[in-house]
Every structure is written in structure tokens, then in C-alpha cells.
Amino acid sequence: MRFFYKLALMTTVASLACSDTALASTDLMPFNVAETQVSTHDIVSAGRSLRAEDTSTSIDNLRDPTMKEKIQFKLWYTRGKTPGQVHRDFFEGLDESIIVNNPNYEVWKMYEAYYNNKKGND
């Protein structure tokens, strides 16, 4: 009886070990989508979209901050960081054309709006 249990246990362990290696070596095929005129162009206007960059820094054009950004803004505000200090931390020594295209520029503009809103409420 004892031999039967050892044999069953060894068989189970061996089959689990083999199935893990078989699963690890399985490669998934990438899913590619062909670019067609329907998928890449506007059907209604059948025209090309404009590629002009919108570099306006209006507060109305800002997206809503994510939860992580809201927490970061609150942390900066409680530590007494002004938008100027945050701007210096992010962009010190960078050219203005590089700054405008930097993803942190939008975060800085949102913090500036947050800071001005908090200062206005105080």
C-alpha cells in the first residue's frame, strides 16, 4: 500500500512539473491588424486630419488629473512647493520647445491650476 501512495505522489509531481514547463515554453502569436482605409481614415469627411499641434496652455484644455497625480499635487501642496519650484525640478536647463512637448509639462500645468485653486480658496 505504501508503495502505491509513493508511486501516485511521484507521478503527480512529475506530471505537474512537465505541464509547467510545457506552459512556459508556449509562445503566443502576435495579433496584427492590417491598416485599411476604413480603419485609418475618417469615413464621414473622407479627408485627412490636420496634424497641427495644439500648444495652448489654457486651463480649459487640461485633462482631469489621475488619482496618482491628485495625491502628488496634495503632497507638493502640503510640503509648500510652488508651481515655480516644481517647474524648476522638472525642466531646469531645458529649452522651451522641449518643455512644451514633455509629458510632465501637462502635469505641471495641472499642478499650477490646483495650486491657484487652493490659494484662491484659502
Swiss-Prot record:
Q: Which domain of life is it from?
A: Eukaryota
Key words, A-Z? Host cytoplasm, Host nucleus, Secreted, Signal, Virulence
Please indicate the residue ranges that the annotation assigns to the motif RxLR: 48-51
Where does the secretion signal sit in this chain?
A: 1-24
Induction and repression of expression: Expression is up-regulated in spores.
**GO (cellular component) term, any one:** extracellular region
List the subcellular locations. Secreted; Host cytoplasm; Host nucleus
> Can you quote the domain comment?
Has the canonical translocation RxLR motif, but lacks the canonical EER motif, which characterizes most oomycete effectors identified so far.
Similarity comment: family membership: Belongs to the RxLR effector family.
What is its biological role? Answer: Secreted effector that does not suppress pattern-triggered immunity (PTI) in plant host.
The protein's name is: Secreted RxLR effector protein RXLR-C251
Origin organism is Plasmopara halstedii
